[in-house]
Amino acid sequence: MIANYQQPGAAIDYTNSTGDTIKAGQVVSLTTRIGIAGTEIPAAAVGSLHVKGVFTMDKASGAIALGAAVYYNASTDKITTASSSAVPAGWAIAAAKSEDTTVQVCIG
């Protein structure tokens, strides 16, 4: 097989099929991972979705250790360490205390 280089892969073109506008910075579930909207993406339009990088995201209660695998819970719109009913998001690049409201996540 021959593989042809396409792009660095830090962002992808994403067709918004949600029926609603996706806001810039909004987390988008890609079933087995997440992306972050780089710009506002109107319904049925194509826009940029970051799939690599470090992002500060809202987190659920509870401490998160440096290096912990983290997940996106769409029902709460928060990052958690609980994998049940959640989408893999990446890993925590810094520890977050239980009382912290955000965590730094490396996606991709």
Where is each model-derived feature located?
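Surface-exposed, low-hydrophobicity beta-strand/loop segments enriched in small/polar/acidic residues
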Residues: 1-108
